[in-house]
Amino acid sequence: MLSYCLLVTGPAYGTQQASSALQFAQALLAEGHKLESVFFYREGVLNANQLTSPANDEFDLVRGWQQLGDVHQVALNVCVAAALRRGIADSQQATQLNLVGANLQPGFILSGLGELAQSVLTYDRVIQF
């Protein structure tokens, strides 16, 4: 059994990266591997946008990640710098920066690149999507 971290750099919609990452994560867990963390970076931070509203006939990828994190206790880390550049903030950042409101999906955590560096050093595999 290996421990994994996924690095997601693609947005929730518009490319296949994030949906492929979620399917890979589900397959890892089904095979008995341990998925410790998913780190969302660059455009991947858009997977944590609470205001995303897909069409009724589309899979809700943001809530799919949230469910994966909740059910399997996977840390959903979002790069704080990349998130703020793309208009995603939690309540603490929104207050600190005098933003209108927060829109980080529950279950996701704003974190720094140090969290990703720690994952690279700690887990058996880091896979980028």
UniProtKB/Swiss-Prot annotation:
Pfam families from the UniProt entry: DsrE (PF02635)
Q: Which GO terms describe its molecular function?
A: sulfur carrier activity; sulfurtransferase activity
Cellular component per GO?
sulfurtransferase complex
Transferase as a keyword of this entry, yes or no, is yes
Active site, UniProt feature: 79 (cysteine persulfide intermediate)
Tell me which UniProt keywords the record has, alphabetically: Cytoplasm, Transferase, tRNA processing
Instruction: Identify which top EC class this enzyme belongs to.
Output: transferase
What EC number is given for this enzyme?
A: 2.8.1.-
Subcellular location(s) of the protein: Cytoplasm
Q: What is its main location?
A: cytoplasm
Q: Which GO terms describe its biological process?
A: tRNA wobble position uridine thiolation
What the entry lists under HAMAP family is as follows: Thiourid_synth_D (MF_00390)
Oligomeric state and interaction partners are given as:
Heterohexamer, formed by a dimer of trimers. The hexameric TusBCD complex contains 2 copies each of TusB, TusC and TusD. The TusBCD complex interacts with TusE.
Database matches in PANTHER family: PROTEIN YCHN, SULFURTRANSFERASE TUSD
The text of the family note is: Belongs to the DsrE/TusD family.
Q: What does this protein do?
A: Part of a sulfur-relay system required for 2-thiolation of 5-methylaminomethyl-2-thiouridine (mnm(5)s(2)U) at tRNA wobble positions. Accepts sulfur from TusA and transfers it in turn to TusE.
| Descriptive protein name | Sulfurtransferase TusD
Q: Which organism is it from?
A: Pectobacterium atrosepticum (strain SCRI 1043 / ATCC BAA-672) (Erwinia carotovora subsp. atroseptica)
